């Protein structure tokens, strides 16, 4: 491999032109047909006032622009033929999937702790079929998209994500969504350990907690696990002549 070539996955057959995306810590290349855009947990629970994060005391006031930028990333991906994967985090209405006191999730999940502290919230937070669990109105899956429920922070845990990606020859995962420092980072890390290239579009993500957690998560990702870019760069890369080139 050329030492000056950008990082990332390129089809070794040379049949497809690799897209080069400006990113930190260095530019990263990917093939559109070996890439998915992952939208992590853009549910009312995480992005809307009155949802779980808001009720648990987290600030969701800045999620509006994030939703708009995710919509742009989704539109750019679809126009380039990149499949979109949507995650929804939560459990069955009886919370069997959440685990009981023998599970660390029972002790650490802020949703479960909020419901124990406020019994009137029981079966309202992150329960499948509820408003809290639903995706925000501004973001809607389309036919051909993949929608996956997940019971823990990582999208690889107890889901068919890995097998679905491998069946389609996917090597690069582009991430958007909430929360950067929890489910986004957890899924990207798990992907890294499964040999996927992970890219985060930073301005299409939002942290759970103070802004320092966003900065820390992105720094951690770019230093150890993947690459960090933004929506405008993603749009520009996909609309470039390079992205449209398919060598004979």
From Swiss-Prot:
Enzyme nomenclature, EC number: 3.5.1.110
A Pfam family hit: Isochorismatase
Matches recorded under InterPro entries: Isochorismatase-like_dom, Isochorismatase-like_hydrls, Isochorismatase-like_sf, RutB
The keyword Hydrolase belongs to this UniProt entry's keyword annotation: yes
Origin: domain of life: Bacteria
Record keywords, A-Z: Hydrolase
One example GO MF annotation: hydrolase activity, acting on carbon-nitrogen (but not peptide) bonds, in linear amides
Catalytic activity, as annotated: (Z)-3-ureidoacrylate + H2O + H(+) = (Z)-3-aminoacrylate + NH4(+) + CO2; (Z)-3-ureidoacrylate + H2O = (Z)-3-aminoacrylate + carbamate + H(+); (Z)-2-methylureidoacrylate + H2O + H(+) = (Z)-2-methylaminoacrylate + NH4(+) + CO2
Residues annotated as the enzyme's active site: 41 (proton acceptor), 150, 183 (nucleophile)
Biological processes, Gene Ontology terms: nitrogen utilization; uracil catabolic process
NCBIfam families according to UniProt: RutB
Recorded family membership: Belongs to the isochorismatase family. RutB subfamily.
Biological role stated in the UniProt entry: Hydrolyzes ureidoacrylate to form aminoacrylate and carbamate. The carbamate hydrolyzes spontaneously, thereby releasing one of the nitrogen atoms of the pyrimidine ring as ammonia and one of its carbon atoms as CO2.
HAMAP family, sorted: RutB (MF_00830)
Name of the protein in its database record: Ureidoacrylate amidohydrolase RutB
Lineage, opening ranks: Bacteria, Pseudomonadati, Pseudomonadota, Alphaproteobacteria, Hyphomicrobiales
